[in-house]
Curated annotation (Swiss-Prot):
It is found in: Mitochondrion membrane. It is an enzyme of class 7 (translocase). This is NADH-ubiquinone oxidoreductase chain 3. It catalyses: a ubiquinone + NADH + 5 H(+)(in) = a ubiquinol + NAD(+) + 4 H(+)(out). GO terms for molecular function: NADH dehydrogenase (ubiquinone) activity. It comes from Zea mays. The lineage of its organism: Eukaryota, Viridiplantae, Streptophyta, Embryophyta, Tracheophyta.
Length: 118
């Protein structure tokens, strides 16, 4: 149990630092803002054109999630490409299986219409 002491100390210290950083603004902040200009959104010196908290279309979220998912796989390609001359046939075919799963996933998204912007 003693070998986990540094991890526990690290977790306690990080929790304390997080709580302190969350609590300090409440101690020093004031709610005496009676000016409505201070509560409005700032748009590069111009008067705001509309509400700053407007809703986004769900397609933006879908495209961003798809981008994150398929962009994350690029992080697997780089170590594989760097160590391609050192891995054996199993490493090569496992990456080919991974690429096949990615290809099937992108075909599925394409057929479902997630990539079409209507």
């Amino acid at each position: 149990m003693l070998e986990f002491a540094p991890i526990c100390i690290y977790l306690v210290i990080s929790l304390l630092v997080s709580l302190i950083l969350l609590g300090v603004p409440f101690l020093f902040a004031s709610n005496s803002s009676t000016y409505p200009e201070k509560l409005s959104a700032y748009e590069c010196g111009f008067d705001p054109f509309g509400d700053a908290r407007s809703r986004f279309d769900i397609r933006f979220y879908l495209v961003s999630i798809l981008f994150i998912i398929f962009d994350l796989e690029v992080t697997f390609f780089f170590p594989w490409a760097v160590s391609l001359n050192k891995i054996d046939l199993f490493g090569f075919w496992s990456m080919m299986a991974f690429l096949l799963i990615l290809f099937i996933g992108s075909l599925y998204e394409w057929k479902r219409g997630a990539l079409d912007w209507e």
